[in-house]
Amino acid sequence: MTTATTAAARANRGSQTHGRSPEELRELVSHWGAELELAPAETIIEWAAATFGEKFCVTSSMADAVLSHLVSSVVPGIDVVFLDTGYHFAETIGTRDAVAATLPVNLLSITPVQSVAEQDAAWGKDLYKTDPDQCCALRKVAPLAEALSGYEAWATGLRRAETKNRVIAPVLGWDAKKGKVKVSPLARWSD
């Protein structure tokens, strides 16, 4: 199932109920991080689903469908958040559509407030070339922050093998900017 949403009109699961405080969430990371560090990806996902319930989602760039497939096998019906920046290749959109059609997930295709044409009119053509930071803020950072607002934790497909900056990425971490628990069940996976 695919749900297309815009930044102006989003309704996340659980956004009407009060969740844990940032201190409580950080305590969960502190308590469980080391214990889950060597756990299989499925165990990490099971823990996150049991701990956060409907306040747990997955973000996916659709570079592949591994994480969506893995999480949906453990937590059928989970929300999978995809940022449709307006700049994706057709293959990426095809993967998104295949995930929505073949996996038991609730795919949320999130779009920025402005279309690419509206952004070009407001900021000039090809903002990603002239001011990539502003472009990312408008097309990725702000929409993701809003999309995650109703959740306490989210799973990412981050892997330590991807870059040297991610070599020490924990499977369970605290994202202070987002005020959320970041779950990386694939962190220990290699190429």
Task: Specify the residue positions occupied by each region the protein language model found.
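Nucleotide-activated chemistry modules centered on ATP-dependent adenylation/adenylyltransferase
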Residues: 2-191
